[in-house]
Amino acid sequence: MQEYTNHSDTTFALRNISFRVPGRTLLHPLSLTFPAGKVTGLIGHNGSGKSTLLKMLGRHQPPSEGEILLDAQPLESWSSKAFARKVAYLPQQLPPAEGMTVRELVAIGRYPWHGALGRFGAADREKVEEAISLVGLKPLAHRLVDSLSGGERQRAWIAMLVAQDSRCLLLDEPTSALDIAHQVDVLSLVHRLSQERGLTVIAVLHDINMAARYCDYLVALRGGEMIAQGTPAEIMRGETLEMIYGIPMGILPHPAGAAPVSFVY
C-alpha cells in the first residue's frame, strides 16, 4: 500500500460559541472538541444549526459569541493561505465548473500553495494525479466535469480538496443530490481517505443510517442546541433518536454486524 502523510493531529475546538441573527438565535452556546483524524457527522433536523456550525468552522461567518480554535490557535489568527492549507470546505451548492476537465478542476486545489501567479511545478502535477487516482477518476481525468454523473462529479470535487493537501475537510451535505449507490460510493471514499491520511472530516449528513455507518463520531443538534454526541453505537438508540428528531424511532441490529439500523414506527 502507498504511504501517505498522516495529519491526525489537526482538529477544531469550540469554546462557548453561539450565532444570532436579528430576532433569532440559530446556534445556542456550544463547547465541543472534534475528534482529530476521524470522521464526525453533524446530524439533526432541517434548521437545527448543522450548516451554520459548519460555515463558522470554514470562516464563512464568525460566531456571535465565543471562540473557535484550530490547532489551539484562534480561527481569526490564521492567514487566508495558511487556513486553506489546513482546511478545505465543500459547500452543498457546488460552484459551476463549465468547460473544465476533471484534471483542471482538481488542479485548482493547489492554489493555496502558490497564489494566482505562482508556478505550477512537477510536485503540483504529482499531487493532482495522486488525488485523481485516489478517488478512482483516472480514466475520466480528461472528461468535462459537467459530463460526469452525480457521484463522479462529487468525487472530482473531493479530489480537488485532496489535492489542496489540507488536513481537515468540511463537507456540507455531500450526498444530498445523490442516489443511494452514489451516497455509499462517496461516503466510503471519505471514510477511506480519513483512515489512510489521518484527515479530520466534519460532514453535515441527513441520513442517520448512512451517518452511523460511515462516521466515527456523531454530534446531534436540535433547535440550535447540541443535545447528544458520541459514537454511532452510543447515539443509535431509540430514545436518543426520538430526542434528536422528535418522532418515535426504533433500532435493529445490522445483519452484517455493522452499525445498528434505525427505523420510524
Swiss-Prot record:
Residues 12-248 form the ABC transporter domain. It comes from the Bacteria. GO terms for molecular function: ABC-type ferric hydroxamate transporter activity; ATP binding; ATP hydrolysis activity; ferric iron transmembrane transporter activity; siderophore uptake transmembrane transporter activity. It catalyses: ATP + H2O + Fe(3+)-hydroxamate complex-[hydroxamate-binding protein]Side 1 = ADP + phosphate + Fe(3+)-hydroxamate complexSide 2 + [hydroxamate-binding protein]Side 1. It is a peripheral membrane protein. Its main location: membrane. It is found in: Cell inner membrane. Disulfide bonds: none annotated. ATP binds at residues 44-51, 168-179. Keywords: ATP-binding, Cell inner membrane, Cell membrane, Ion transport, Iron, Iron transport, Membrane, Nucleotide-binding, Translocase, Transport. GO terms for cellular component: ATP-binding cassette (ABC) transporter complex; ATP-binding cassette (ABC) transporter complex, substrate-binding subunit-containing; plasma membrane. Part of the ABC transporter complex FhuCDB involved in iron(3+)-hydroxamate import. Responsible for energy coupling to the transport system. This is Iron(3+)-hydroxamate import ATP-binding protein FhuC. It comes from Escherichia coli (strain K12). The lineage of its organism: Bacteria, Pseudomonadati, Pseudomonadota, Gammaproteobacteria, Enterobacterales.
